[in-house]
Design a protein with these regions (language model features):
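AAA+ P-loop NTPase catalytic core and its hallmark functional loops
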Residues: 2-188
Length: 188
């Protein structure tokens, strides 16, 4: 088995996530793997152990900061809105986004890393040019990027360091965030 330096949140806290999902009786927003209350419990921990299959599970606190901020993030995402975490370096923005993604979508690795060289095809989609030449524009020739994957699967897409990307890349996200539609004009 291959080990990584820092396994994704959904791997590190697999047992906690599984227990919370299986004991969660709250209403889940569309495409959420657990209710907003269970997401809050996963991130902020629980003073009381969770009983599951005859065992007690302690849900540890993972985010040590402003609890109200976590709650506002959860409410924003439950309202099907985009969420942008802005702050000084080292203030746990990435960690909080990973925790939210793992709890809500079951995956925290659907991520775009923003740089000055980020292009639209790195965030939306690109093409397998051999297939494109052989078969023309088709779903088979399309190579999905994180934003496409997120929209197709109904999972969160994390965008790290968005302010480092060119303005036109940031502008191209506005329509996707407001309309919740990613157009692929080549497919008609």
């Amino acid at each position: 088995m291959q080990e990584s330096i820092k396994p994704p949140v959904e791997v590190r806290y697999k047992e906690e996530l599984q227990v919370l999902r299986n004991t969660d009786t709250g209403r889940r927003p569309e495409n959420w793997r657990m209710s907003p209350m269970a997401v809050r419990t996963f991130i902020l921990g629980s003073a009381q152990p969770v009983q599951y299959e005859g065992k007690e599970y302690h849900i540890e606190k993972k985010y040590f900061g402003n609890n109200a901020l976590v709650e506002r993030c959860i409410v924003t995402l439950a309202g099907n809105r985009g969420l942008m975490l802005v702050g000084e370096p080292g203030t746990a923005k990435t960690m909080l986004s990973e925790l939210l993604s793992a709890a809500i979508s079951g995956v925290s690795t659907n991520t775009i890393q923003g740089t000055a060289g980020t292009t639209e095809d790195m965030i939306k989609y690109s093409w397998n040019y051999a297939l494109l030449l052989a078969k023309g524009p088709s779903r088979e020739a399309l190579v999905p990027a994180p934003l496409y994957v997120g929209m197709e699967k109904g999972i969160l897409t994390r965008f790290e360091e968005i302010t480092r990307t060119p303005a036109e890349i940031q502008d191209s996200l506005i329509s996707v965030l407001s309309d919740k539609v990613l157009n692929v004009p080549e497919l008609g």
